[in-house]
């Protein structure tokens, strides 16, 4: 069916006392992203013309964290219930648009479920998302007559008979803007909590003869809210299990799906293998036949075909061409670039550095602010000294250079093609093509040398 224009209201004013945190509840993260951002993203994908965010506690921190100029920020100075929160947003509703109500602490709601709810909304009526629970205690119970939804009774206000009703309200609903404003204006706080319940609009709509269509989510976990860290941790595991399942079904080999975390977006080629305890953050692309060892962290990086990253390596904001090998225990920091066939071994760190085709840095090395050519050997213990205490400087190493172990290159410095730098050398001046450079303290031999003896 053809949907009306739609705006979304996200309720995010709660303090989250049971989180025991100075951070507003909706800013606590799931899969590396604030809970409320998951909800905002769902609203955006659904095609919301406007997203109204109702905030209260921690408003400044919310604005600093989300930094979204497309949000309409609506202050709820006093937390007097969900109906009161919607009343604060009501002046922004257009009469001819639909209004979808979501919650900033219900992060797993899916676009697919929301689209079904949107499609099911009757003309002039309400679309209501409900679930059935074995134990409905503490929730708002759905009342029906002859199968039709007639209202919602909060648990504290319900009779013993009503408390046995297993179908409960999730709080997510959609209605026309003009209708919603009219119903909101009629809400009262005559209940056990002394609050304005948004759920009371269901009875108001029924009294007007409007139809209420109840829709169930694909998974109950989509409507699970978060009130404490235990609940958040459970949703994290549900979310990660779902992501792992999608990857496995798309052909990615996760050696232990229960020990894999995706905290962003992952694009994979064919025959990718990922070992246990790997964390993917941000936007990551893995080419064909990539292998990621146990305990690695990959963030905002592109990994080319046939690359292998050995265990406990960290790759952040880096770009690897085909057939590169990394680690174990390597660290690629932002700006690291490896051309085809390059190798970075154990305890090697790169930052804003380019390692050419077939070049190798095998052990215990720091390469920062450096441009390194093709077929270069970087010996163990090599350091590019890029910082003078105030500014950073660049090291340039040409093709086919051999850098011996324990070499320091004091930037700015350039080493020409084919040059050889002897072990233990400190390079402070430019080196011409094909030169041999060495700087060592003369070796001294003392015959009959006696070691010092400790005093008794």
Swiss-Prot record:
GO MF entry, a single one: UDP-N-acetylglucosamine diphosphorylase activity
Source organism (scientific name): Salmonella agona (strain SL483)
Family the UniProt entry places it in: In the N-terminal section; belongs to the N-acetylglucosamine-1-phosphate uridyltransferase family. In the C-terminal section; belongs to the transferase hexapeptide repeat family.
Gene symbol of the encoding locus: glmU
Keywords from the named record: Acyltransferase, Cell shape, Cell wall biogenesis/degradation, Cytoplasm, Magnesium, Metal-binding, Multifunctional enzyme, Nucleotidyltransferase, Peptidoglycan synthesis, Repeat, Transferase
Textual note on the cofactor: Binds 1 Mg(2+) ion per subunit.
Name of protein: Bifunctional protein GlmU
Chain positions recorded as UDP-N-acetyl-alpha-D-glucosamine binding sites: 11-14, 25, 76, 81-82, 103-105, 140, 154, 169, 227, 333, 351, 366, 377
InterPro entries, per the entry: Bifunctional_GlmU, GlmU-like, GlmU_C_LbH, Hexapep, Hexapep_transf_CS, MobA-like_NTP_Trfase, Nucleotide-diphossugar_trans, Trimer_LpxA-like_sf
Residues holding acetyl-CoA: 380, 386-387, 405, 423, 440
GO biological process terms held by the UniProt record: cell morphogenesis; cell wall organization; lipid A biosynthetic process; peptidoglycan biosynthetic process; regulation of cell shape; UDP-N-acetylglucosamine biosynthetic process
